[in-house]
Swiss-Prot record:
Annotated Mg(2+) 2 binding sites: 217, 220, 255, 257
GO cellular component: cytoplasm
Lineage: Bacteria, Bacillati, Actinomycetota, Actinomycetes, Kitasatosporales
Record family assignment: Belongs to the xylose isomerase family.
Protein name: Xylose isomerase
Species, as recorded: Streptomyces albus G
Length: 391
């Protein structure tokens, strides 16, 4: 297989990813600032489909209207020159100290109103640039101490904010949807809507739930010790996987933001297998940080590695699914039986069926092997390249 990405693969990168200067809580920047125009051009050369941005990635905070116009003009020209797209945008409601207690759920009402206006302004720009999805990551929406935040009131304010944003895009006739990005902690001690499940439940309480989905990130769910492919499967099942952030993470620790495939490789394999077999058609968006040890050559090598790893895993997953021995193993593990309704004949037929309870041989059923180990080893063989690739 050719592992050279093309725009048809729909790989996208946030400007903040390759543009990360390497500054962390313990050390200053190790790289200089990267011009967004340079990011667009270099990513296009690597075969990416598009870029995404926070408002402050593209337009420095506090810019005048004329400065804002020039920043957008240069960026738009770079998009036109390269054919790169902007499928998604988002708002930075976490860097400036005004957001130290959050944006949509800050205890201060004036901060909440400012956060909404800042978001609405960038939604206008996102639509202007062709974005179809608007991500909301509430990194500062949370608390470090129990008395600091009435979570019920905070959720009311969160609902109010999203309902207002939904009203705004509807009134403007914008063809854009929102994707809530969960995270359990960091930078706040505890963040509201910490997992995919929390976000899905919250969405059902909104006035226009059809406008809202989720943007799960590999590392965020794994920080909570959760199975990321399972979370994605539930989002797909709910029809709410509006966007996805791909990166690498090694277990329950700080948000590592490694390049995709550099963390839990088995989970990455099952994730790609799921996305490809489920027919997910959205961008494959990389939200990672090139390590601060790297110069700019390393930045671009890291970005290229994200795409290459995805394509390798896509090939391995396709080979796994096409392998006749795997197909036989899937049947032996009775995956086809799981796909059959348990009681398509209805409740009464179930109650009347003596073989379902009175005559059910629990000992015989308990003695059946599931053959999962053989199936899993076949997956490992494909992941590790010990079996042939798909034709």
């Amino acid at each position: 297989m050719n592992y050279q990405p093309t725009p048809e693969d729909r790989f996208t990168f946030g400007l903040w990813t390759v543009g990360w200067e390497g500054r962390d809580p313990f050390g200053d920047a190790t790289r200089t600032a990267l011009d967004p125009v340079e990011s667009v051009r270099r990513l296009a050369e690597l075969g990416a489909h598009g870029v995404t941005f926070h408002d402050d990635d593209l337009i420095p905070f506090g810019s005048s209207d004329s400065e804002r116009y020039e920043h957008v003009k240069r960026f738009r020209q770079a998009l036109d020159d390269t054919g790169m797209k902007v499928p998604m945008a988002t708002t930075n409601l976490f860097t400036h100290p005004v957001f130290k207690d959050g944006g949509f759920t800050a205890n201060d009402r004036d901060v909440r109103r400012y956060a909404l206006r800042k978001t609405i302004r960038n939604i206008d720009l996102a639509v202007e640039l062709g974005a179809e999805t608007y991500v909301a990551w509430g990194g500062r929406e949370g608390a470090e101490s129990g008395g600091a935040k009435d979570v019920r009131d905070a959720l009311d304010r969160m609902k109010e904010a999203f309902d207002l944003l939904g009203e705004y895009v509807t009134s403007q006739g914008y063809d854009i949807r929102f994707a809530i990005e969960p995270k359990p902690n960091e930078p706040r001690g505890d963040i509201l809507l910490p997992t995919v499940g929390h976000a899905l439940a919250f969405i059902e309480r909104l006035e226009r739930p059809e406008l809202y989905g989720v943007n799960p990130e590999v590392g965020h769910e794994q920080m909570a010790g959760l199975n990321f492919p399972h979370g994605i499967a539930q989002a797909l099942w709910a029809g709410k996987l509006f966007h996805i952030d791909l990166n690498g993470q090694n277990g329950i620790k700080y948000d590592q933001d490694l390049r995709f495939g550099a963390g839990d490789l088995r989970a990455a394999f099952w994730l790609v297998d799921l996305l490809e077999s489920a027919g997910y058609s959205g961008p494959r968006h990389f939200d990672f940080k090139p390590p601060r040890t790297e110069d700019f050559d390393g930045v671009w090598a890291s970005a290229a590695g994200c795409m290459r790893n995805y394509l390798i895993l896509k090939e391995r997953a396709a080979a796994f699914r096409a392998d006749p021995e795997v197909q036989e193993a899937l049947r032996a593990s009775r995956l086809d039986e799981l796909a059959r309704p348990t009681a398509a004949d209805g409740l009464q037929a179930l109650l009347d069926d003596r073989s379902a309870f009175e005559e059910f041989d629990v000992d015989a059923a308990a003695a059946r092997g599931m053959a999962f180990e053989r199936l899993d080893q076949l997956a490992m063989d494909h992941l590790l390249g010990a079996r042939g690739a798909a034709a």
